[in-house]
Amino acid sequence: TMEFVSMMDRYIEQLPDLIFKPADFVFGSFTAEGEWIMKRFRAYSKYPVRKRLLMVAEDIRDRYETEAVMEAEGAPLRTRTVAKSLGSMLTMKNTLAVYKDFYKRTGNRSMLVMPFKKTLEWADVYPFLYLHSVIEGVKESSLTKHLVVDEMQDYTPVQYAALNRMFPCQKTILGDFGQFINPNHLHSLAD
């Protein structure tokens, strides 16, 4: 439902504070404060969490080199070293942990049914993919210039949300006249 997508979007807005608890990064006499790290992390909000960590790691390395600490210490600071340290500051390490946390925090823990360990039901694929795009990122199709979606009434709002993440191009959505994604809520062109 649209309400479910709205719940996911609200959760995604809170996610930076839930998933990342930065501490000071120390390398020799150099220190990047946790507060500064969080500001950099938030500055890259349009990127997935994993990419943000890498970008912040590069910022820390650049700051280290700029402050000329490298010359005094003599040891080079590698982006990979910083990224690994930042990764350890994540409170949830993968999309499945984030997906479980979403259901826990929204009070819908009983809605998440996992038939086997680390196995989701089909109904969970698109919501999981939607969150995965925020955590790990998804490969966007740059080759697709226009996406045509037929039988629109067979898709749920969360499926459309996930498709929008994967295909950031223009879309044409087709369906039979009088059929709706949610028959209990009519939308106009103004919506």
Positions of predicted regions on the chain:
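Conserved helicase NTPase catalytic core signature
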Residues: 2-146, 159-160
